[in-house]
Design a protein with these regions (language model features):
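Catalytic Walker B motif of ABC-type/P-loop ATPase nucleotide-binding domains
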Residues: 178-181
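Conserved ABC ATPase signature
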Residues: 153-157, 161
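H-loop/switch region of ABC-family ATPase nucleotide-binding domains
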Residues: 213-214
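Helix-to-loop junction immediately C-terminal to a conserved catalytic motif
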Residues: 64
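Conserved ABC ATPase "signature" region
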Residues: 131-149
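The feature captures the beta-strand-to-loop junction immediately N-terminal to the Walker
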Residues: 49-51
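Conserved ABC transporter NBD signature motif
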Residues: 72-84, 95
């Protein structure tokens, strides 16, 4: 993708990596996202919090291009992401390589016969050398401790194992931003520790993370910037200990 105007040159303002401007999205006649605006800069770790039905998952899907806004605008790295943009096969492929999305339910994204094939599928589409592909797959599987499952069927794994495989499959593509819908749901304490350590290292390396969660302790542990979305779709920057009693009642 070409650089957006105004983002190059000494002293030039750099566009946010993610920007939603008054985004509206409806499903089956019901407004799910109503005028939401937010920004995520490069190198940030941002957590979306809020009650069920506030639109967190839909926002994630909009950012990944799985849904398109009915009104408003979504910009990624200064580029408007809309139907016209996504019809450009080259631009669309590059966009989806740069934005890694992990579903809350890992079953929604696992489709290969073995774990090894699952983790290799994404980077295999990137024109990498055989050695680079093998290295990416090996490193991602080791990172999320699923190397011993290389020949296993993803469908026979536990929920926590599936989540770690899904993370490895996305991380193997080395995206610029990880968009994670409830990344620690269904994970035991050890698996949570693996994910937390990875996310901290990922952001320290200059990458970006946007995640949804209901767990305040996870947000505090990660030192994430918290964005709270209430049931009326109001977006509020908030400190984790006081972002609203409404969220405490969620899930």
């Amino acid at each position: 993708m070409n650089n957006a105007a105004g983002t190059n040159g000494a002293g030039a303002e750099v566009a946010p990596l993610i920007e939603l401007r008054d985004v509206v999205f409806s499903y089956a006649g019901h407004t799910v996202v109503d005028g939401v605006s937010l920004q995520v800069d490069r190198g940030e770790l941002v957590a979306l919090l809020g009650p069920n039905g506030c639109g967190k998952t839909t926002i994630m899907r909009l950012i990944n291009g799985l849904e398109l806004a009915d009104a408003g605008a979504y910009l990624f790295d200064g580029h408007v992401i809309n139907a016209t943009f996504l019809k450009d096969s080259v631009a669309s492929q590059r966009f989806h390589q740069r934005v890694g999305f992990v579903f809350q339910n890992a079953d929604a994204q696992l489709f290969c016969a073995t774990v090894g094939e699952e983790v290799a599928f994404g980077p295999a589409q990137m024109g990498l050398s055989t050695d680079e592909l093998k290295c990416r797959v090996r490193d991602a599987m080791e990172l999320f401790q699923v190397s011993d499952l290389v020949d296993a069927s993803p469908y026979q794994l536990s929920g926590g194992q599936k989540k770690r495989v899904a993370l490895a499959a996305v991380v193997s593509m080395n995206p610029d931003i990880l968009v994670l819908d409830e990344p620690t749901n269904g994970l035991d304490e050890d698996s949570c520790d693996i994910v937390v350590s990875f996310l901290l290292a990922y952001v320290a390396a200059g990458k970006t993370v946007l995640m949804s969660t209901h767990h305040q302790d996870l947000v505090r542990r990660l030192g994430a910037r918290a964005i709270y979305i209430d049931r009326y779709h109001h977006v509020v920057e908030a400190s984790v200990p006081s972002y609203g009693t409404e969220s405490a009642a969620a899930e």
